[in-house]
């Protein structure tokens, strides 16, 4: 309902900030806090009290970004990854367009209020879906707890615990199968909530915006999840799967082909309602006959990126 209505996203903006960070840097990098980050610290704004000159790992920054919704950390991540905040914002908007967002425009990395900072429930779901393809993103967006070790300017650990009602185990709104999400709130945006759940191999994403409170947002999200799992099944299509209403077959769907980020994507519709999108696999070229297979000694090489990824695990 109202999936394409333009609204203020508040802190669910940080989903895009997280995605760009895990795509563009190592979690082991040190982030040095400058006035860029610390200027966004205020009593009524989510923060962890960072100071100018304080150093923290990118991993710790990202957990603070998601779990505590720390705005000064969002600003510092933007400067660290993009060189400048403005360049990072440009990266956010470019990545949103690549993902397929058509009604989104960011002006900061945190979601603090600005008339020109907006999105839609549909676009935020697309960003979340893209993020869930990344293992680091999934691990961080689904964390319920994290302890930041003492830093060069803070002798005490900072203990973080999620305030996402559907993710927190102790919450009365906890949803069995919830794998992560992000909360948001400003007086202009109301309460915003992005949530992902996975059951029986099927993942659904819900987005609520401008809710009266998190209880309403969580209740609505739970109703959406229950409806999806009770009334939809997976159907095999070219290159993947889409969820279709019970009793509907692939023959009942219409397909619209488009290009996304240089790849061909098929959008599947039922009664003019978009059910899902699947990237069309490229045709496998016919291999050329081997001239001298025994002379190929490259098989023992290991991709350095794979080595880096394996080494970059949560400590």
Describe the residue ranges of each PLM region.
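Domain-terminus/edge residues, biased toward the C-terminal soluble/receptor-binding domains
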Residues: 101-102, 113-315
């Amino acid at each position: 309902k109202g999936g394409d209505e333009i609204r203020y996203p508040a802190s669910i903006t940080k989903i895009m900030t997280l995605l760009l960070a895990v795509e563009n840097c190592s979690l082991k990098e040190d982030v040095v806090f400058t006035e860029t980050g610390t200027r966004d610290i205020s009593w009524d704004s989510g923060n962890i009290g960072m100071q100018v000159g304080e150093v923290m790992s990118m991993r710790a920054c990202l957990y603070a970004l998601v779990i505590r919704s720390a705005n000064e950390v969002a600003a510092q991540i933007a400067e660290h990854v993009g060189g400048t905040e403005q360049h990072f914002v440009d990266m956010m908007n470019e990545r949103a367009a690549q993902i397929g967002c058509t009604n989104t425009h960011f002006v900061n990395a945190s979601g603090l209020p600005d008339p020109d900072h907006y999105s839609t429930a549909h676009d935020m779901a697309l960003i979340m879906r893209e993020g869930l393809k990344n293992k680091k993103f999934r691990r961080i967006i689904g964390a319920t707890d994290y302890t930041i070790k003492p830093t060069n300017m803070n002798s005490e650990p900072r203990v973080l615990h999620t305030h996402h009602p559907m993710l927190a185990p102790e919450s009365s709104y906890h949803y069995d199968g919830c794998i992560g999400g992000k909360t948001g709130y400003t007086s202009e945006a109301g309460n915003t909530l992005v949530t992902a759940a996975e059951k029986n191999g099927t993942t659904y994403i819900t987005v609520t915006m401008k809710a009266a409170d998190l209880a309403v947002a969580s209740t609505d999200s739970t109703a959406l999840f229950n409806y999806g799992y009770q009334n939809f099944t997976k159907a095999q299509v070219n290159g993947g799967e889409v969820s279709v209403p019970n009793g509907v077959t692939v023959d009942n769907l219409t397909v619209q082909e488009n290009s996304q980020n240089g790849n061909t994507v098929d959008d599947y519709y039922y009664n003019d309602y978009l059910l899902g999108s699947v990237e069309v696999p490229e045709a496998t070229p016919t291999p050329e006959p081997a001239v001298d297979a025994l002379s190929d000694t490259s098989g023992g090489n290991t991709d350095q990126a794979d080595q880096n990824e394996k080494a970059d695990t949560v400590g």
